[in-house]
């Protein structure tokens, strides 16, 4: 399966909503899984790979087209977080690194402080 995180706004708060897509592919075919994941993401620009992904020692390297960058050459924090969260669900992935033009890209701000789920009791 491939898990894709999209966002949904409820009561003026943005939440990451996971959707699981069942696919038939070779277990080792990480490029196909990442391509499907990117195609399933709701984003105003097409998301695509420009080079093969690599998975070494638990680190998945994803090489993306430059069209995902904003005018100031940075990536949208929400998009970055969605890609990393989605890719982290792939088998054997412990860390995700995103690259554009062979340069590793980072979010403008730390995405680890985001709240994924809130349950009101």
Model regions: which residues?
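Bimodal "functional hotspot" detector
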Residues: 1-121
